[in-house]
Amino acid sequence: MCIRDSSFLVQDQQGQRFEAILKSFDRNSLLFTPQKPVAIPPASSLRIEILQALPKQKALDFILQKTTELGVSRLDVFCGMHSPKTFRASEKQHHLKRWQRIVSEASKQCGRQFAPEIHFHPDISAALETLPECPNSWVLVPEEADAVSWKKISSSGDDIIKHHRVLIGPEGGFHQDEIKLSLRSGMHPVYLGPRILRSETAAMSAVSILQFLWGDL
Protein backbone atom coordinates (compact mmCIF):
# COMPACT_ATOMS: atom_id res chain seq x y z
CA MET A 1 0.00 0.00 0.00
CA CYS A 2 1.28 3.49 -0.88
CA ILE A 3 1.19 6.05 1.93
CA ARG A 4 0.95 9.72 1.00
CA ASP A 5 4.03 11.80 2.00
CA SER A 6 6.15 8.67 2.42
CA SER A 7 9.61 8.59 0.85
CA PHE A 8 10.94 6.09 -1.67
CA LEU A 9 13.67 5.78 -4.31
CA VAL A 10 13.24 6.45 -8.03
CA GLN A 11 15.69 5.89 -10.86
CA ASP A 12 15.67 7.69 -14.21
CA GLN A 13 16.62 6.34 -17.64
CA GLN A 14 20.21 7.56 -17.19
CA GLY A 15 20.60 5.39 -14.11
CA GLN A 16 20.57 8.27 -11.60
CA ARG A 17 18.72 7.65 -8.33
CA PHE A 18 16.80 10.10 -6.17
CA GLU A 19 14.88 10.07 -2.95
CA ALA A 20 11.31 11.20 -3.63
CA ILE A 21 8.22 12.11 -1.62
CA LEU A 22 4.89 10.66 -2.73
CA LYS A 23 2.20 13.34 -3.10
CA SER A 24 -0.72 11.54 -4.69
CA PHE A 25 -1.56 8.42 -6.65
CA ASP A 26 -4.35 6.65 -8.47
CA ARG A 27 -4.67 3.37 -10.36
CA ASN A 28 -2.61 4.59 -13.31
CA SER A 29 -0.11 7.13 -12.00
CA LEU A 30 2.00 8.48 -9.16
CA LEU A 31 2.78 12.12 -8.43
CA PHE A 32 5.97 12.62 -6.46
CA THR A 33 8.47 15.35 -5.64
CA PRO A 34 12.18 14.56 -6.23
CA GLN A 35 14.40 15.28 -3.24
CA LYS A 36 18.13 14.65 -2.84
CA PRO A 37 20.17 12.39 -5.15
CA VAL A 38 21.21 9.01 -3.75
CA ALA A 39 24.64 7.46 -4.26
CA ILE A 40 24.66 4.47 -6.60
CA PRO A 41 26.54 1.35 -5.49
CA PRO A 42 29.69 0.84 -7.59
CA ALA A 43 29.50 -1.64 -10.44
CA SER A 44 31.29 -4.94 -9.98
CA SER A 45 34.94 -4.83 -10.97
CA LEU A 46 34.54 -8.38 -12.30
CA ARG A 47 33.08 -8.85 -15.79
CA ILE A 48 31.05 -12.06 -15.93
CA GLU A 49 29.35 -13.23 -19.11
CA ILE A 50 26.84 -16.10 -19.12
CA LEU A 51 26.33 -18.13 -22.29
CA GLN A 52 23.08 -19.94 -21.51
CA ALA A 53 21.41 -22.73 -23.47
CA LEU A 54 17.69 -21.95 -23.58
CA PRO A 55 15.90 -23.65 -20.64
CA LYS A 56 12.21 -23.54 -19.77
CA GLN A 57 10.76 -20.04 -19.60
CA LYS A 58 10.33 -20.01 -15.81
CA ALA A 59 13.93 -21.14 -15.32
CA LEU A 60 15.25 -18.53 -17.75
CA ASP A 61 13.30 -15.77 -16.00
CA PHE A 62 14.94 -16.82 -12.73
CA ILE A 63 18.40 -16.88 -14.33
CA LEU A 64 17.96 -13.43 -15.84
CA GLN A 65 16.74 -11.95 -12.57
CA LYS A 66 19.18 -13.54 -10.12
CA THR A 67 22.36 -13.26 -12.20
CA THR A 68 21.51 -9.60 -12.76
CA GLU A 69 21.26 -9.12 -9.00
CA LEU A 70 24.64 -10.85 -8.60
CA GLY A 71 26.34 -8.48 -11.04
CA VAL A 72 26.60 -10.35 -14.35
CA SER A 73 27.65 -8.07 -17.23
CA ARG A 74 26.27 -9.91 -20.25
CA LEU A 75 23.86 -12.76 -20.97
CA ASP A 76 23.85 -14.63 -24.28
CA VAL A 77 21.00 -17.10 -24.81
CA PHE A 78 21.06 -19.76 -27.54
CA CYS A 79 18.91 -22.71 -28.58
CA GLY A 80 20.73 -25.80 -27.35
CA MET A 81 20.38 -29.25 -28.87
CA HIS A 82 18.65 -30.41 -25.66
CA SER A 83 16.69 -27.21 -25.03
CA PRO A 84 13.04 -28.01 -24.19
CA LYS A 85 11.80 -25.61 -26.87
CA THR A 86 13.05 -23.27 -29.54
CA PHE A 87 11.44 -20.34 -31.32
CA ARG A 88 11.44 -18.90 -34.79
CA ALA A 89 13.68 -16.02 -35.87
CA SER A 90 10.56 -13.87 -36.24
CA GLU A 91 9.95 -14.21 -32.48
CA LYS A 92 13.43 -13.02 -31.52
CA GLN A 93 12.58 -9.38 -30.89
CA HIS A 94 9.52 -10.28 -28.83
CA HIS A 95 11.58 -12.47 -26.50
CA LEU A 96 14.48 -10.01 -26.30
CA LYS A 97 12.14 -7.21 -25.22
CA ARG A 98 10.68 -9.41 -22.52
CA TRP A 99 14.12 -10.45 -21.26
CA GLN A 100 15.34 -6.85 -21.28
CA ARG A 101 12.36 -5.84 -19.19
CA ILE A 102 13.16 -8.55 -16.64
CA VAL A 103 16.82 -7.52 -16.24
CA SER A 104 15.88 -3.84 -16.17
CA GLU A 105 13.45 -4.42 -13.30
CA ALA A 106 15.99 -6.61 -11.47
CA SER A 107 18.68 -3.94 -11.89
CA LYS A 108 16.47 -1.27 -10.34
CA GLN A 109 15.48 -3.56 -7.49
CA CYS A 110 19.09 -4.35 -6.53
CA GLY A 111 20.45 -0.83 -7.07
CA ARG A 112 22.44 -1.41 -10.26
CA GLN A 113 22.88 1.65 -12.43
CA PHE A 114 22.68 -0.23 -15.73
CA ALA A 115 21.20 -3.56 -16.75
CA PRO A 116 23.36 -6.28 -18.34
CA GLU A 117 23.47 -6.74 -22.11
CA ILE A 118 21.26 -9.50 -23.53
CA HIS A 119 21.76 -11.26 -26.88
CA PHE A 120 20.16 -14.24 -28.60
CA HIS A 121 21.75 -16.77 -30.98
CA PRO A 122 20.09 -19.59 -32.94
CA ASP A 123 22.61 -22.20 -31.76
CA ILE A 124 25.90 -22.61 -29.90
CA SER A 125 27.98 -22.40 -33.07
CA ALA A 126 26.56 -18.98 -33.93
CA ALA A 127 27.07 -17.80 -30.35
CA LEU A 128 30.73 -18.86 -30.20
CA GLU A 129 31.45 -17.27 -33.57
CA THR A 130 29.84 -13.97 -32.56
CA LEU A 131 31.32 -13.51 -29.09
CA PRO A 132 34.61 -11.60 -28.70
CA GLU A 133 37.61 -13.49 -27.37
CA CYS A 134 37.75 -14.21 -23.63
CA PRO A 135 40.76 -16.25 -22.40
CA ASN A 136 38.96 -17.25 -19.19
CA SER A 137 36.03 -19.09 -20.79
CA TRP A 138 34.50 -22.08 -19.03
CA VAL A 139 31.98 -24.80 -19.81
CA LEU A 140 30.21 -26.47 -16.89
CA VAL A 141 30.60 -30.24 -17.20
CA PRO A 142 28.95 -33.05 -15.18
CA GLU A 143 32.15 -35.05 -14.55
CA GLU A 144 35.29 -34.13 -12.64
CA ALA A 145 37.78 -35.82 -15.02
CA ASP A 146 39.92 -33.26 -16.89
CA ALA A 147 37.95 -30.37 -15.33
CA VAL A 148 39.65 -27.40 -13.67
CA SER A 149 38.93 -25.99 -10.22
CA TRP A 150 38.21 -22.29 -9.79
CA LYS A 151 39.22 -22.60 -6.13
CA LYS A 152 42.66 -23.97 -7.05
CA ILE A 153 43.16 -21.27 -9.68
CA SER A 154 42.22 -18.52 -7.22
CA SER A 155 44.65 -19.84 -4.58
CA SER A 156 47.56 -20.28 -7.00
CA GLY A 157 48.79 -16.71 -6.48
CA ASP A 158 48.42 -15.74 -10.13
CA ASP A 159 47.15 -12.34 -11.22
CA ILE A 160 43.54 -11.57 -10.33
CA ILE A 161 41.25 -12.59 -13.17
CA LYS A 162 38.72 -9.88 -14.00
CA HIS A 163 36.86 -11.31 -17.02
CA HIS A 164 35.08 -14.67 -17.16
CA ARG A 165 32.64 -16.31 -19.55
CA VAL A 166 30.63 -19.38 -18.49
CA LEU A 167 28.71 -21.76 -20.76
CA ILE A 168 25.71 -23.41 -19.06
CA GLY A 169 23.45 -26.12 -20.44
CA PRO A 170 19.64 -26.52 -20.31
CA GLU A 171 17.73 -28.92 -18.07
CA GLY A 172 18.62 -31.85 -20.32
CA GLY A 173 22.33 -31.04 -20.28
CA PHE A 174 24.64 -30.56 -23.22
CA HIS A 175 24.83 -32.74 -26.30
CA GLN A 176 28.34 -34.16 -26.59
CA ASP A 177 28.83 -32.26 -29.85
CA GLU A 178 28.21 -28.98 -27.99
CA ILE A 179 30.84 -29.80 -25.37
CA LYS A 180 33.34 -30.76 -28.07
CA LEU A 181 32.64 -27.55 -29.98
CA SER A 182 33.08 -25.42 -26.86
CA LEU A 183 36.40 -27.10 -26.03
CA ARG A 184 37.66 -26.63 -29.59
CA SER A 185 36.79 -22.94 -29.31
CA GLY A 186 39.15 -22.59 -26.34
CA MET A 187 36.81 -23.05 -23.40
CA HIS A 188 38.00 -24.95 -20.33
CA PRO A 189 35.86 -27.58 -18.55
CA VAL A 190 34.94 -26.72 -14.95
CA TYR A 191 33.19 -28.91 -12.38
CA LEU A 192 30.86 -27.60 -9.66
CA GLY A 193 30.64 -30.73 -7.55
CA PRO A 194 28.98 -34.17 -7.42
CA ARG A 195 25.36 -33.00 -7.21
CA ILE A 196 23.21 -32.64 -10.32
CA LEU A 197 22.19 -28.99 -10.56
CA ARG A 198 19.23 -27.49 -12.34
CA SER A 199 20.15 -25.06 -15.09
CA GLU A 200 19.10 -22.05 -13.01
CA THR A 201 20.96 -23.35 -9.94
CA ALA A 202 24.12 -23.85 -12.00
CA ALA A 203 23.95 -20.31 -13.38
CA MET A 204 23.43 -18.69 -9.99
CA SER A 205 26.11 -20.89 -8.37
CA ALA A 206 28.68 -20.12 -11.06
CA VAL A 207 28.19 -16.35 -10.79
CA SER A 208 28.24 -16.49 -6.97
CA ILE A 209 31.46 -18.51 -6.90
CA LEU A 210 33.21 -16.21 -9.39
CA GLN A 211 32.12 -13.11 -7.48
CA PHE A 212 33.32 -14.65 -4.22
CA LEU A 213 36.72 -15.67 -5.59
CA TRP A 214 37.51 -12.66 -7.79
CA GLY A 215 34.71 -10.12 -7.38
CA ASP A 216 32.94 -8.21 -4.63
CA LEU A 217 31.05 -10.82 -2.59
Task: Locate each region found by the language model.
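Short, hinge-like loop/turn segments at secondary-structure boundaries
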Residues: 93-96, 156, 208-209
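Generic structural signal for residues in well-ordered beta-strands
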Residues: 32, 115-119, 189
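Arg/Lys-rich RNA-binding interfaces used to dock onto structured RNA substrates
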Residues: 9-65
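Short, ordered loop/turn segments at secondary-structure junctions
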Residues: 13, 37, 79-82, 194
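RNA substrate-binding interface of SAM-dependent RNA methyltransferases
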Residues: 41-138
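Structured adenosyl-cofactor binding patch, chiefly the S-adenosyl-L-methionine
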Residues: 176-217
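Conserved small/polar residues in nucleotide/adenosyl-binding loops
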Residues: 1-6
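Active-site/ligand-binding-proximal alpha/beta "capping" segment
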Residues: 134-173, 177-179, 187-190
